[in-house]
């Protein structure tokens, strides 16, 4: 617990939550946003390959992380490049605001020569790093605050990716 610390910022209580709880919060948040613009058709059903499916047939994998304690980065864990989803949404929670970035599934590229996965989006390129040396299934992606968008743009971008704009 962070006793004696300031809890005045809008999301400050999140610092006391475990990673799984933060992930569930992010998923529920995205479901509520998607329900406002499209319909989530399998709310509450656990899937192996995606977290959310909309009525329009678009699937989302949601990863939520809080800002690191000593630097301005977020580590999004448990990304499986082989899973079957249309979009990966990374939600970054700071104590004072929410940030995000949306990636198309086909922006995850395996570079055989380097034997590594990369997230490539226009000029942006970041390596997906194995969660641990023996795990070649789940990866992590570290993003800087500057590589994420303000949450105020999320609905417009979701409408665009869903073809509703």
List the predicted regions and their residue ranges.
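Nucleic-acid endonuclease domains
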Residues: 1-55, 63-165
């Amino acid at each position: 617990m962070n006793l004696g610390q300031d809890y005045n910022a809008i999301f400050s209580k999140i610092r006391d939550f475990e990673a799984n709880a933060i992930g569930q919060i992010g998923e529920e948040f995205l479901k509520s946003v998607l329900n406002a613009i499209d319909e989530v058709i399998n709310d509450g059903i656990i899937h192996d390959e995606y977290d959310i499916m909309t009525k329009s047939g678009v699937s989302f994998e949601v990863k939520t992380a809080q800002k690191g304690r000593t630097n301005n980065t977020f580590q999004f864990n448990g990304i499986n490049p082989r899973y079957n989803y249309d979009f990966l949404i990374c939600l970054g929670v700071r104590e004072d605001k929410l940030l995000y970035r949306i990636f198309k599934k086909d922006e995850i590229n395996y570079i055989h020569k380097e034997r590594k996965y990369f997230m490539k989006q226009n000029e942006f390129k970041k390596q997906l790093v194995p969660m641990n040396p023996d795990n070649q299934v789940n990866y992590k992606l570290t993003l800087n605050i500057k590589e994420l968008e303000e949450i105020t743009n999320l609905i417009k971008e979701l409408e665009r990716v869903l073809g509703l704009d």
